[in-house]
Regions:
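Conserved N-lobe ATP-binding subsite of Hanks-type protein kinase domains
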Residues: 29
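Conserved N-lobe loop of protein kinases adjacent to the ATP-binding glycine-rich P-loop
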Residues: 34-41
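AlphaC helix of the eukaryotic protein kinase fold
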Residues: 48-69
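Activation-segment/catalytic-loop signature of the eukaryotic protein kinase fold
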Residues: 81
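Hydrophobic/aromatic scaffold residues of ePK-like serine/threonine protein kinase catalytic domains
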Residues: 69, 118-119
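Conserved short submotifs of the Hanks-type protein kinase catalytic core
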Residues: 85-99, 103
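C-terminal lobe helix-coil module of Hanks-type protein kinase domains
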Residues: 34, 120, 126-127, 131, ...
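Activation segment of protein kinases
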Residues: 52-55, 148-194, 221
Length: 265
C-alpha cells in the first residue's frame, strides 16, 4: 500500500494531497484527498494494478468520459480521471455520510419507508443514465451513498470498462473483482455479451430484496454457487422472511428479479 501511495503522491503532487485511505475493495482502493486546484476534499479511487493492466488508459478514459457527462441530483459526479504513476484513477466528491452497505451492516433490514425512498432515488439516477444509453452494470449497496435523506449512485462507467477488458473467458474472476455476484443478472452471470439496461433493473431488485429481508437473494459458499443460483433458482418470497412487507412492493421486487430480461419492469 505504501508503494502505491508514494507513487500517487509523486505523480499527483501538483494536483492532489493524499490524506488517508478510506477503504479498499476488489476493484479499487479509495483515498481521501485534497484537490489543490479547487480547494476541496475528494474521494480518489485508484484501480488495482491488474485491472489497470487489463484496461489500458485509452479504454478507461473512453468509458469513464461517457459517464462523466451524466448530471443528476442522485448521481455522484465524476470530477477528474487520469493516469498517475502507472495507475488509473478517478475522483468524485467526498460524501460526508455512509454507504448503503454500511447502513445494512449496522441495522440489517431497513424500514419499508426508508427502503422505498432509497430505491426511488436509485431508480431516478438510473432512469437518467439509461436515457443517455449508459448502463451501470454494478449496482450494489457499496455503490450507493447516503447523504441525509438522499441516495447517490456512484461509479458509472467503471464496471463496463472493467468487464469488457477482462473478457468473457474471465467473467467469474471479473465478477469477484467487482464484488457483484450477489447482484448479477442471469445474463451477466451467463457471460452474455449483449447486456442492456435491464441488468440494472435486476440489480435494483436484488438490492431491494436485501433491504427488505436483511439477506441477499441468493447465498452460497463460493461466488460460482451464487452466480449459478441467479441463473437457475427462484428467489424465496420476501414475506417468508418479513411478513409485514406490502404485497404490492414484494410483487414489484420479484418482477425486477425475473430471469428473462423481457419480463422485468
Amino acid at each position: 500500500m505504501s508503494d502505491t501511495v508514494d507513487r500517487l503522491r509523486a505523480a499527483l503532487a501538483n494536483r492532489y494531497t493524499i490524506e488517508r485511505e478510506l477503504g479498499a475493495g476488489g476493484m479499487a482502493t479509495v483515498y481521501l484527498a485534497h484537490d489543490l486546484r479547487h480547494d476541496r476534499q475528494v474521494a480518489l479511487k485508484v484501480l488495482r494494478q491488474e485491472l489497470t493492466a487489463a484496461l489500458g488508459a485509452e479504454r478507461f478514459h473512453r468509458e469513464i468520459q461517457i459517464a462523466a457527462k451524466l448530471q443528476h441530483p442522485n448521481i455522484l459526479p465524476l470530477l477528474d480521471s487520469g493516469e498517475a504513476g502507472g495507475l488509473l484513477f478517478y475522483a468524485m466528491p467526498y460524501v460526508e455520510g455512509q454507504s448503503l452497505r454500511e447502513r445494512l451492516a449496522r441495522e440489517g433490514a431497513l424500514p419499508v419507508p426508508d427502503t422505498v425512498r432509497i430505491l426511488r432515488d436509485v431508480l431516478d439516477a438510473l432512469t437518467e443514465a439509461h436515457s443517455h444509453g449508459v448502463v451501470h452494470r454494478d449496482i450494489k449497496p457499496e455503490n450507493i451513498m447516503l447523504r441525509g435523506r438522499h441516495a447517490l449512485v456512484t461509479d458509472f462507467g467503471v464496471a463496463k470498462a472493467v468487464s469488457e477488458a477482462t473478457g468473457r473467458q474471465t467473467l467469474t474472476t471479473a465478477g469477484v473483482a467487482l464484488g457483484t455476484p450477489a447482484y448479477m443478472a442471469p445474463e451477466q452471470a451467463s457471460a452474455d455479451p449483449h447486456l442492456d439496461h435491464r441488468v440494472d433493473i435486476y440489480a435494483v431488485g436484488a438490492v431491494a430484496y436485501e433491504l427488505l429481508t436483511g439477506r441477499p437473494v441468493f447465498m452460497g459458499t463460493t461466488p460460482q454457487m451464487v452466480l449459478s443460483a441467479h441463473v437457475t433458482e427462484a428467489p424465496q418470497p420476501i414475506t417468508r422472511f418479513r411478513e409485514a412487507v406490502p404485497r404490492a412492493l414484494e410483487a414489484l421486487v420479484m418482477r425486477c428479479l425475473a430471469k428473462q430480461p423481457a419480463d422485468r419492469w
